[in-house]
Amino acid sequence: MELRDLQIFQSVADQGSVSSAAKELNYVQSNVTARIKQLENELKTPLFYRHKRGMTLTAEGRKMLVYVNKILQDVDELKQVFLDSETPSGILKIGTVETVSTLPTILSSYYKSYPNVDLSLQAGLTEELIREVLDHQLDGAFISGPIKHPLIEQYDVSTEKLMLVTQNKTFHIEEFTTTPLLVFNQGCGYRSKLERWLKDEGLLPKRIMEFNILETLLNSVALGLGITLVPQSAVHHLSKAGKVHCHAIPEKYGSISTVFIRRKDSYMTNSMRSFLKTIEEHHHINML
């Protein structure tokens, strides 16, 4: 069993097919197929179900993937320990929810200070970003917090006011039962706050419409499709233009914190250490 066998196995598991894995790894398909078969023979168990749509992991394959992910992560960290220089460099894979108002400032400041670091950004919802940090797919992520998890450490970024956004100037709480609720998909911190508020009020929304792009969601509110709850900074431009109107909500639900998370047990590169320092500096400025 060689390291590249584990890399091939991981790629096929992630991609769901030999052809996609071969393309990702720049291997010929026959080599990928042969390596997977050799691995199964060596372990004396099938690791994949083969079907017309591709390949999916068996129960033993899922067990194998847990070990493979850990081994390959350890190998990457081992390389990083010896390659990590005093000057931050390399790639930082960072996830973020869409509405972190301080993100452009943080990224700009970091890039100016450490131009040798390549920042790879990926947008997502809080729950999926947490999962990807835990799975070592991301080095860290900006999410709605705070959270509690034994494998995660978090750093304060900002706290923002949440506003109910409507097309009309006035709003009455009973409108939740007559007007569609426009929200991000499950796993969004703003949606969780709004649903908690409605539950406490004993209100059942008329209809829930899910979005995955902030701009589309807000433009839909501006056109009168429904109402939503987002950070004030995210809707400031539309509110200023008079296209939508913002309404305060009870203090208990009216704010949300953004935190930056990373795995506690992941190797702290100089690039990540510098990134955390930049976050801390901007958080301190915002608190003044």
Swiss-Prot record:
It comes from the Bacteria. InterPro entries: LysR_subst-bd (IPR005119), Tscrpt_reg_HTH_LysR (IPR000847), WH-like_DNA-bd_sf (IPR036388), WH_DNA-bd_sf (IPR036390). Residues 18-37 bind DNA. CDD domains: PBP2_YofA_SoxR_like. Transmembrane segments: none annotated. Keywords: DNA-binding, Transcription, Transcription regulation. GO terms for molecular function: DNA-binding transcription factor activity; transcription cis-regulatory region binding. Residues 1-58 form the HTH lysR-type domain. Pfam families: HTH_1 (PF00126), LysR_substrate (PF03466). Belongs to the LysR transcriptional regulatory family. This is HTH-type transcriptional regulator CzcR. The lineage of its organism: Bacteria, Bacillati, Bacillota, Bacilli, Bacillales. The gene is czcR.
